[in-house]
Amino acid sequence: MACRDEVVYDLKDRVRKDRTGHIILDSSRTNRGKTERGWSRAALPLLAWLGMVPVTVPQVSVDHSTTDRLTAPPPSAYAGDAACAMCHRKESEFYKLTPHARDSSPATAKSIIGSFSQGHNVLHTANPNLVVNMVAAPDGFYQSAVNLADQSRLAERFDIVIGSGRHGQTYLYWQNDLLYEMPASYWTWNHGWVISPGFPAGQVHFDRVIVPRCLECHASYFTSQAPPPNRFQKDNLVLGIGCERCHGPGTQHVAHERSATIRHSEKLDEAIVNPARLTRDRQLDLCALCHAGAVEPIRPPLTFIAGDNIHDYLAIQPPTPDTPPDVHGNQVGALEQSKCFTSSKMTCSTCHNVHVKPENADAFSPHCLGCHEISACGRYVALGSRIRTKCVDCHMPMLASAKITSNSKEGTLHPLLRAHQIKVYAEASETVERSLLGK
């Protein structure tokens, strides 16, 4: 999410520096946050993000043709999850518990998983004089950066939570209609606060802008009001990943199903997308929108609709021997390099049912054993049927991400995430074998 010419705060020197190293004295600060001693907000980076202002367009065609769609569908094209739940109550209730549904939410005591209790609410940075305190106040929750040398501080309120907490969370705040990322995140794998990925070591700043592409993968709907790139219309921001991100705009479908004359007809309703009926490539494209690694937008955000060709919207950088797919963010690229993928017709949904909360790794093994005989495993002779639940741990182990890192006082932290290139990982297999043998 970092912008290459963003400005950073160095509280130790009590100045701000741009990326070229120029020092700019702080003289004033005017915003909603709690401030002391004249801290000022760094100048906003003005990025050239062309075509980000949506305009009203006609009702989306049921064939989801991408030829002329250069703007996002209007809010009126979307029915909302509540409308879906009226007929799909069971699916809706299960889906509410999934990481996708909870991928973004308002910041509350329930949605923020990091601790605000004494002894667990302080993030020590690589700068011994700089800490970030997590503060619960009557009017909300705050991140407060403190210079211990002189007790000067800069604080902003948690407004939006990004991430269900399955792996971690990052937090955003509003300054009027401008959206920014906060400097402290929470990682579940080490159960603690960390400097947000990409932030410099020993520094804290509150000026990392949230661009439309960020929200395209972490929200259901928004209206960009760029420039600057982080200006959004607050009253129509829909958090979480809702039904219509994978099924397409649903207003026409709801109207169809509510019609007394054609309700529940046997004829396929072409006004809604059933991903299971898409071709293999289009199914993969639906996931690739947010799980294809390094991409460059071709068209404005939210113009992609389920059933579209992703290459009309994103320029996807293919993996190479020098740039293999990382375990974070490029699950599709990794899967496509797997022999299981190239020798079958599998898609993401072969193993993942996005309507229900993910199972643990052991529960995925039956998907593997639907194609592979357990006796064909090289560890079968030594371990027998004990390996029946260990397919994923051996062939899709948890690996350290090279793309998502945090600069801590202990050094660079790398979160562990599930690999999606299915292959033999000798070290992982040996670890599983030792565990099963009690070694």
Regions found by a protein language model. Give the residues of each.
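Bacterial N-terminal signal peptides that target proteins for export
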Residues: 32-44
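Intrinsic-disorder-associated, low-complexity terminal segments enriched in Asp/Asn/His/Tyr and depleted
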Residues: 10-13, 18, 22, 26, ...
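Extended acidic/polar, glycine-enriched regions
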Residues: 196-211, 220
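Bacterial N-terminal signal peptides
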Residues: 43-54
